[in-house]
Swiss-Prot record:
Mediates folate monoglutamate transport involved in tetrahydrofolate biosynthesis. It also mediates transport of antifolates, such as methotrexate and aminopterin. PANTHER family: FOLATE-BIOPTERIN TRANSPORTER 1, CHLOROPLASTIC (PTHR31585:SF0). It comes from Arabidopsis thaliana. The lineage of its organism: Eukaryota, Viridiplantae, Streptophyta, Embryophyta, Tracheophyta. Signal peptide: none annotated. CDD domains: MFS_FBT. This is Folate-biopterin transporter 1, chloroplastic. Keywords: Chloroplast, Membrane, Phosphoprotein, Plastid, Transit peptide, Transmembrane, Transmembrane helix, Transport. The keyword Oxidoreductase does not apply. The keyword Cell membrane does not apply.
Amino acid sequence: MASRSLFSISISPSQFTVLPSINNERRRLAIAARSHRLSRRKIRKRPPDRDMSSIVSIPELPRRRDSEESLLLDSRISVAEGDTSNTDVEGDRDTTSSIRTQPPPRKGRNLSSSRIKFYGVELSPDNVAVAMVYFVQGVLGLARLAVSFYLKDDLHLDPAETAVITGLSSLPWLVKPLYGFISDSVPLFGYRRRSYLVLSGLLGAFSWSLMAGFVDSKYSAAFCILLGSLSVAFSDVVVDSMVVERARGESQSVSGSLQSLCWGSSAFGGIVSSYFSGSLVESYGVRFVFGVTALLPLITSAVAVLVNEQRVVRPASGQKENITLLSPGFLQTSKQNMIQLWGAIKQPNVFLPTLFIFLWQATPHSDSAMFYFTTNKLGFTPEFLGRVKLVTSIASLLGVGLYNGFLKTVPLRKIFLVTTIFGTGLGMTQVILVSGFNRQLGISDEWFAIGDSLILTVLAQASFMPVLVLAARLCPEGMEATLFATLMSISNGGSVLGGLMGAGLTQAFGITRDSFGNLSTLIILCNLSSLLPLPLLGLLPRDSPDTLTKDDADVEMKSN
């Protein structure tokens, strides 16, 4: 191939068209042929080194097929040599063939390694859309503190009423499998994922816009908060299904990296919302925060266009598939899914641990009463409560680290036993804050509240991680996503029931927005009630998490 390069430089077809004399042409041909033979002799005297191919400029071109390369080389040779050098060209064919069997590395391979990655996941438009949806779910906590102050200060509700509205707002999280059935079986405008993300974002923006400008009663507030919760729950199911689809067929490291990206995006959004939630409420008011929150779900609608999804078509005709909630196909599919789901849940090895999770979550709590006490009695400002919320968001990550570092190898029964007992004892420290004993110890109310929230949140998150691991273990092969969503819905149902029971106890003890005489008794009773499920620890599996697969450790760490 080197000889061809030299030959093409010394002879050009254009040289034969401008000379008037035939003798000169013959003389030039003879000189050129002689110089060509000499150059080939010099090349043959060199060692048989295949590295000579490095001087050829052809490897810079895209390498597609050997036939294309041969055609390209032959065309260059014919142009360079004309009709007078066929013999010499044939003599060089073997060298060309040997060089062509060692193609240079493809440039496309280097491009993939230079793409941006985060948590080990390539930041393709599709993955960016998934991460942004999880980020929005985390940052929507911006309105949580504003809702609490709105119900307390603007609508003048008692702690019990606030607890009821908070519990009702969690109802959409109890039917998450239904959203999965709808998304899988009923394409909207030809898409199963993209359209529902757009719709969820618009629904969330609509609900928070109503909260920002039109809501003026507890009933309308409860309705709008319920709509906002529905939008988040539906988008959560849709994006979870997208993650499952992308993780299917991938290696464990890729699946774990994708889960880490989702969890990291949600946690980052939660920390951002915690940092700004209190200061925005104090500086601009709750209506302004609701207006800002109304813009956030639109991010979900906007990034939905980045989702890589094929339009659903009918296999036979190729026309767009049009299925409604009342169509026979959807009803039949839903019926089959429900039968299959119930067949899995009623198995003793699934039903009994699920029953324990529900009862463990269904114990009453006094969160609403404590919020009223800290704001109306202790005078905690929205900005300070926002800082406390920031601390608890970081503490939640510390709780996950505590579980991953020290508790993964501990049997499940022992984890629930130890964390429940310690949580009950540490929960009693709220009585110190209510009684003011911390001030006698020289600790201010603010610092005691921060420290108490930090410790309790770390322990609560560490104790909740086994619930996620257990739920993942209970899911049989083939219906992991559906059954996991069902188990999380049952867990959320227990939490809602606990909140409603706490509201009833708050009302029974006569705790109002200005009267906190029995708050210490309520705190003690709620903490002691968390010990009630312990005799049922025998419902849990006996084995240790050492037997778990690595996939169980990659469960998405979301309490919702």
